[in-house]
């Protein structure tokens, strides 16, 4: 297996979970993950922040605030909802993951926040959302607490 750092975009297209983990491991801690928030205005106008961080050296891209039911990535060309992740992967050539947030039953959010940052149903760590994310093409899921 190649080290992650020696892989090309076409290598990532065909990688399965085990191969991706082995490639990361073989890179001995030299893989950089960068988190972006797709609902925010892009730093470069019509270029997504995911593309921007990839151009700056991010090896893997983590999308925060990504709602699997209502995906929004500012700066992305018109794309069907279920194809948003695949489009980001195509544009960046990088593995792409999302954050999902565990939530206690009966709670709407893990923190008090304003409406913009309020936890939506498509961002909660549920089996259904994880399955939807995988169907959309995510390479990894991070369980997080914002």
Model features per residue range: what roles?
Residues 45-69, 74-76, 109-146:
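Alpha/beta enzyme core
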Residues 1-37, 81-93, 97-99:
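N-terminal amphipathic alpha-helix/helix-capping segment at the start of soluble metabolic enzymes
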Residues 66, 80-102, 108-124:
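A generic, well-ordered mixed alpha/beta core segment in the N-terminal half of proteins
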Residues 35-41, 66-68, 99-105, 146:
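Active-site beta-loop-alpha junctions enriched in small/polar residues
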Residues 12-16, 42-45, 80, 121-125:
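Short secondary-structure boundary/capping elements
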Residues 1-4, 8-21, 42-43, 63, ...:
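Glycan-processing catalytic domains of CAZymes
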Residues 22-23, 43, 50-51, 85-87, ...:
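Short, flexible, glycine/charge-rich loop motifs used to bind or transfer phosphoryl groups or to couple energy/partner
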Residues 29, 35-54:
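Active-site-flanking structural segment that lines cofactor/substrate pockets
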């Amino acid at each position: 297996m190649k080290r992650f750092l020696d892989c090309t975009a076409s290598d990532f297209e065909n990688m399965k979970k085990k191969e991706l983990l082995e490639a990361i491991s073989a890179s001995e801690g030299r893989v950089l993950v960068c988190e972006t928030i797709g609902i925010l205005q892009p730093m470069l106008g019509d270029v997504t922040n995911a593309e921007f961080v990839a151009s700056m050296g991010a090896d893997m891209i983590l999308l925060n605030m990504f709602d699997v039911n209502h995906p929004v990535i500012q700066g992305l060309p018109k794309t069907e909802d279920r194809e948003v992740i695949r489009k980001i992967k195509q544009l960046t050539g990088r593995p792409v993951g999302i954050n999902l947030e565990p939530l206690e039953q009966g709670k709407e959010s893990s923190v008090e926040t304003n409406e913009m940052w309020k936890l939506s149903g498509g961002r909660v760590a549920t089996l259904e959302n994880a399955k939807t994310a995988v169907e959309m093409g995510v390479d990894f899921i991070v369980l997080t607490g914002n």
